[in-house]
């Protein structure tokens, strides 16, 4: 398993912020599919998915903007700081399942 630092931009009521997550997956395809699943399910009522990298909701807009494979030491440092949410991806790229370090499903936390 490898860990990526994934970045998303979130616009909410005219304010844009960057959100980063640590994504642990078997390969880049699985990691990217997990980020796309996060974007699709950020809030409950998806209005529009644009090019599989931008999602529009009544509450705001989410963009997938970066993914970087981390070296082991980088992963260790970022996890040690404890300020980023860490997700482990299982399942197939067309149906990824994301769980945090306590076993909570992404869909249960965001809804």
Language-model region placement:
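Conserved short hydrophobic patches within well-ordered secondary structure
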Residues: 8, 22-24, 64
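Short, mixed-charge low-complexity intrinsically disordered segments
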Residues: 37-111
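Short amphipathic alpha-helices within nucleic acid-binding modules
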Residues: 29-34
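A short, exposed loop/beta-hairpin motif centered on an aromatic-Gly-Thr core
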Residues: 16-28
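Short aromatic-glycine-(Arg/Gly/Cys) micro-motifs in beta-strand/loop hairpins
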Residues: 1-19
């Amino acid at each position: 398993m490898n860990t990526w630092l994934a970045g998303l931009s979130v616009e909410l009521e005219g304010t844009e912020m960057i959100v980063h997550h640590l994504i642990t997956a078997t390969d880049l395809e699985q990691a990217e599919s997990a980020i796309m699943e996060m974007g699709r399910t950020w809030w409950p009522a998806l209005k529009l998915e644009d090019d599989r990298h931008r999602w529009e909701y009544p509450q705001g807009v989410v963009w997938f903007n970066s993914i970087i494979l981390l070296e082991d030491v980088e992963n260790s440092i970022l996890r040690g700081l404890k300020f980023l949410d860490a997700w482990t991806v299982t399942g197939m790229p067309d149906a990824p399942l994301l769980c945090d370090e306590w076993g909570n499903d992404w869909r249960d936390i965001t809804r």
